[in-house]
């Protein structure tokens, strides 16, 4: 298969062998256009973003990305089923949210994951995209490994010992592309473990692991609960055992020094992603009331007046036992956003989990209890945006505040009695300040959910640079409407995960019966990875008189985008949906 070939469901990738001949001359790269072999480059390093302006306001965006990837041999050649147990923390009343207990399969493979915006776009690219375009369509994806180098490490007998590095022309790099998505899907952006965001800095793939079924019970408690919390292991249900190995499920290709590997092209089937936000809440839908009296002079204290008595107005409501028509009671066409139990932890047979909700800005974002919005909070290290000269292990963190404004303000919610009466007495209305179950500081908006068939939702925004780009559709009969981690959800199939592993490089002392650990020569690899991600975008047209806010720099943040005097760099998150649009 040559470069640019279509990668169908179940299609096999292309492997180009570029080993040197006895004379030292390399063979021609299959489709790559360059010669190969030891000491001869066989590929190109390209991190340019190309914008091709088409007809009718469309733009084709080709994002090229290249990285030098370093890979050590695995600690063990074995698959391991590992239980993570922190019952010492959850044994204390009120500590349910500290629960980390789970079981995972740790594999000897590593995952090359490019599924994050920062892998593909620099801040300048992102500025051009969000300032000039209104929507993105995800078109295609391809990736390649080339210029493979494998080296062995030995130590001299001198004191102190000296490490010696030698090229090993017969060692192998194992590469597997799961084009059928047979393996568990494990996007690494949720752990900030994708390829790094700086093209000039080497990066590493993440060790590949996946969840294994494990039942347990954790009974909720608070600090005043008497007795020790119930925390019980139940083990693995034999009906649910699924142990996957790459070696017997995915074709594995063996590359040696100078070899290349190409996946071919995957074409996406996804709905487009908007680069605009909506501001209309339910109070801004439809025709406003007619004003009988308009202001006669300028000034913020001069108001208009509806004029008609509230119980004599015309219109439609869903309020029984009253004739009052107000901006609060008139019937709106649908529910924009929804009140979500945004600090709700659900219980599952494998432990508690925070309920995911769709992000959407709530009010002025002044106080935590006004933000019923699910804005994602990212923690990341020096490969993914933290200042590269930072010392210590504490990650950097940002909260991405989505621009989609659902207008939620939980402090102002209330529930009326039936039949509706005005004014209401204390036993006719439930306010956020009313205690539930004798508790204070908890109101019904923590448990109240207005999601339903009348709910209007925006998809999640692109989060630059740390956010995930695409996600895999659930294999269920009923599909979720949005996925909260990524704006693009692949229908039917998504790009196959790319796995790599340094093959076992054995010594003459290997005895399969002697030990579970192989006697191996210390071997590592580095190789060049490159990819191409293609989008189509629609140029944004202006339909308003006023100019709008756009992404820019100023005197306060200009140095976020340039290195310090010792090379310190960081990447700050950027808004992706600055331009407003009406939704009705």
Curated annotation (Swiss-Prot):
Region (Disordered): 1-41
Record has Glycoprotein as a keyword: no
Entry keywords, A to Z: Capsid protein, Clathrin-mediated endocytosis of virus by host, Cytoplasmic inwards viral transport, Disulfide bond, Host nucleus, Host-virus interaction, Magnesium, Metal-binding, Microtubular inwards viral transport, T=1 icosahedral capsid protein, Viral attachment to host adhesion receptor, Viral attachment to host cell, Viral attachment to host entry receptor, Viral penetration into host cytoplasm, Viral penetration into host nucleus, Viral penetration via permeabilization of host membrane, Virion, Virus endocytosis by host, Virus entry into host cell
Disulphide bond pairs: 490-494
Keyword field contains Magnesium: yes
Chain residues that bind Mg(2+): 180
An MF annotation (GO) of this entry: metal ion binding
Pfam families: Parvo_coat
Places the protein is found: Virion; Host nucleus
Annotated GO CC locations: host cell; host cell nucleus; T=1 icosahedral viral capsid
A biological process term (GO) from this entry: clathrin-dependent endocytosis of virus by host cell
Residue ranges with Gly residues bias: 23-40
Domain notes: The N-terminus of VP1 is sequestered within the mature capsid. It contains a phospholipase A2-like region and nuclear localization signals that might be exposed by capsid modifications during virus entry.
Miscellaneous comment as given in the Swiss-Prot or TrEMBL entry: The capsids of autonomous parvoviruses expose a proportion of VP2 N-terminus and part of that sequence can be cleaved of to form VP3.
Sequence similarity: Belongs to the parvoviridae capsid protein family.
Function of the protein: Capsid protein self-assembles to form an icosahedral capsid with a T=1 symmetry, about 22 nm in diameter, and consisting of 60 copies of two size variants of the capsid proteins, VP1 and VP2, which differ by the presence of an N-terminal extension in the minor protein VP1. The capsid encapsulates the genomic ssDNA. Capsid proteins are responsible for the attachment to host cell receptor TFRC. This attachment induces virion internalization predominantly through clathrin-endocytosis.
Subunit (UniProt): Interacts with host TFRC.
Protein's recorded name: Capsid protein VP2
Organism: Canine parvovirus type 2 (CPV-2)
